[in-house]
Amino acid sequence: MNFEVLYQDNNARCGVFNFNQEIIETPVFMPVGTYGAVKSISTEEIKNTGSRIILSNAFHLYFRPGLEIIKLHGNLHNFMNWSGPILTDSGGFQVFSLSRFCKINEEGVIFQNHIDGKKTFLTPKISMKIQSDLGSNIVMIFDQCIEYNQNWEKTKNAMERSLYWAKKSRIYFDSYKNKNSLFGIIHGGIYPSLRDISLQELIKIDFDGYALGGLAVGEPKIEMYKLLDHICPQIPKNKPRYLMGVGKPEDLIEGVRRGVDMFDCVIPTRNARNGHLFVTNGVIKIRNKKYKKDLSCLDNTCACYTCRYYSRSYLHHLDACNEILGARLNTIHNLHYYQTLMSNIRNSIKNNTFEQFSLNFYKQKNKIDF
């Protein structure tokens, strides 16, 4: 993977990834396909929304269907029929959030897995092997995630352990001699001084990109934005910056404003399944009775399949009947909205009009939210 910044408007950046001749423009939003599938839609439909890179979770795929099944197909790309790049999360967050039992030592984590309750040992070495077997284009290091608002000492200990695991991840990743990329993850909770130490030590190890972890876990938005203001300027300018798990539309705007290049989040797909649909002027809650006889499309500025062929009335009906087609059409629309937003952001950076674009975005937003 090669990465290059081509345009800059203040701190907002527009660049390109080159994955073996496949070009991905940044800033980029990655739909989440935890189990090798973006919920309710096919890979062809994912592409038609404008999505070019997706995220899957190595932790979940390790347990279901298991590496043996995926390797029968060659790799995760073949298994799910996706020709584009895939980023895999190592599973650090899931180990700490899903396990009923979790014991940490310097080598890794012993936990009770959520599938069959068996005790499992996961280490940086095992995580790198899993992601190598999956054929991930971007591999994330194995890290320790902690809850928001932990005290300084607990946060420092977790950050230092993540750094130790980062070094181990680098060693084991390099041993596979593949051409994929490895990203480090900056930790340190809400403490800027710990974030500084984490980043500087990760830079010494030298990763292909740097992710900001441990955010969107309950902290006020203003704290997240302050941390981005603090840490993004310190990340090497020639390396991509990835804000993990953050993805409300306004978060994309504010992340890009501060120099972030990559995002992922379940919000567009999860909200779609709950009937919350993003449009130019805000959010439509399609199960509201007022849409029962509404013959208009969701958004007359949207060119997605859903808006071209279906009315709000029909989408309201599908939601009321809990029809699977409703989740599919809603997901197509929300992902198309997100990818159109990212495309417009990129164009505004190229034209040095990002600030005006963001002002217009906020002026239009929240005119409807019902």
UniProtKB/Swiss-Prot annotation:
The active site is at residues 89, 264. Pathway: tRNA modification; tRNA-queuosine biosynthesis. It catalyses: 7-aminomethyl-7-carbaguanine + guanosine(34) in tRNA = 7-aminomethyl-7-carbaguanosine(34) in tRNA + guanine. Zn(2+) binds at residues 302, 304, 307, 333. GO terms for molecular function: metal ion binding; tRNA-guanosine(34) queuine transglycosylase activity. GO terms for cellular component: cytosol. It is an enzyme of class 2 (transferase). GO terms for biological process: queuosine biosynthetic process; tRNA wobble guanine modification; tRNA-guanine transglycosylation. Substrate binds at residues 89-93, 143, 214. SUPFAM superfamilies: tRNA-guanine transglycosylase (SSF51713). Keywords: Glycosyltransferase, Metal-binding, Queuosine biosynthesis, Transferase, tRNA processing, Zinc. Its EC number is 2.4.2.29. Belongs to the queuine tRNA-ribosyltransferase family. Catalyzes the base-exchange of a guanine (G) residue with the queuine precursor 7-aminomethyl-7-deazaguanine (PreQ1) at position 34 (anticodon wobble position) in tRNAs with GU(N) anticodons (tRNA-Asp, -Asn, -His and -Tyr). Catalysis occurs through a double-displacement mechanism. The nucleophile active site attacks the C1' of nucleotide 34 to detach the guanine base from the RNA, forming a covalent enzyme-RNA intermediate. The proton acceptor active site deprotonates the incoming PreQ1, allowing a nucleophilic attack on the C1' of the ribose to form the product. Homodimer. Within each dimer, one monomer is responsible for RNA recognition and catalysis, while the other monomer binds to the replacement base PreQ1. This is Queuine tRNA-ribosyltransferase. It comes from Buchnera aphidicola subsp. Acyrthosiphon pisum (strain Tuc7). The gene is tgt.
